[in-house]
Amino acid sequence: MIRYISLIFFVILLLSCNGNRSDGSSEVGDTLQMRYARNLTIVTYSDHTEVTLRNPWDTTGVLGKYSLTSSLKGEGRIKIPLQRAAVFSSVHCALFHELRADDAVGGICDLQFFNLPEYKKGVAEGRIANLGNSLQPNLEQIVNLNPDAILPSPFENSGGLGRVERLGIPIIWCADYMEDTPLGRAEWIRFYGRLIGRADEADSIFSAVESRYLELCNKAHNAKTKPRLLPEMPWSGQWTLPSSGSSSAKLYADAGAEYLFAHLKGSGGIPLSTEKVVDKAVNADIWIIKHHGPLDRQQMISDTPLLAGIKAPIWWCDTSTTLLYEETPFHPERLLEDLIAILHPELGIEPKYKYFSPLSTSPSGE
């Protein structure tokens, strides 16, 4: 009896010790401590790195699992550093640029929304392939490019990439935008840095981002007021607002704002009718809007008369001329600094990066 108990104990002990071991190896991996990212796990071994992406829409499942190695020996492995990747988003291209890895990008999508001159020039000169629309990429162009990996952003219930997924090219899902805190998303820079051989540099950048972000949070926490904040504007009769579980809602709180729709449960954006939003928005102190192209308040009211009831001053960002979308996902401290300067001018913060400007046109009747 004692012999059987000893055997069972030995088996349990053996299994428990295999938790962070690579497949087919007795080596114990070193798990990288992620301080904020909830959907990312990185375990390093002597000859490769294993990365697991948790499914943000079903947290009991896995969105992707990758084995990064300098050798292609072994099924399911991705050779790093990437040499010719298809990077669908300007957000991630901007990060590759910051990490001095422009040469690792062989193709991009949605060129019309790129504000990065290096990549526009690359497409014009034929060094970078234009792969078309990110939701329906050009299959022929991808085949011609023959990238070593494809980096798209996943969307819930989108059906994936269709025939592209059958090409046999590794697909690395860039689900960083589904993290529920700004620093959680920014921490993904550590993953992307490992894809392009810039791990130490990426870790250093994130450390600086974290330090500055927390410093700014402390300053905003000491502010004596909490202005009521209204974000975004309606589109086609609907007003999509950040839910309480989104990184945007967390950012507003960290900036010392009272987000008027912090009661919205869920993650990501929540679409509401314009009427429902305006009922509460009339109490806003500050209205911030991101808009692709020029913005005119009188035209907004002409298009949607209900907006005349909102008297809050507008601060807007023209995303066609600024690098808001390219810079701030992995540098939330830059956006936080700008928002604190808008919400709490009494703190005397002078932002190095300015994305929002006051919209000069006053609301009708003022």
Where are these predicted regions, by residue range?
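Bacterial Sec-dependent N-terminal signal peptides
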Residues: 1-24, 339
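Bacterial Sec-exported substrate-binding components of ABC uptake systems
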Residues: 17-93, 201-230, 342, 347-366
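A short, structured surface patch at a secondary-structure boundary
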Residues: 49-52, 57-67, 74-143, 149-156
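Second-shell loop/turn segments in exported
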Residues: 75, 80-84, 95, 127-133, ...
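Extracytoplasmic ligand-binding site segments that recognize negatively charged/polar headgroups
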Residues: 92, 108-117, 159-161, 175-190, ...
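Soluble non-cytosolic domains of exported or imported proteins
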Residues: 132-137, 154-158, 179-186, 200-207, ...
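Structured C-terminal subdomain patch of bacterial secreted/periplasmic proteins
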Residues: 179-207, 214, 286-366
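Flexible, glycine-rich surface segments
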Residues: 211-299
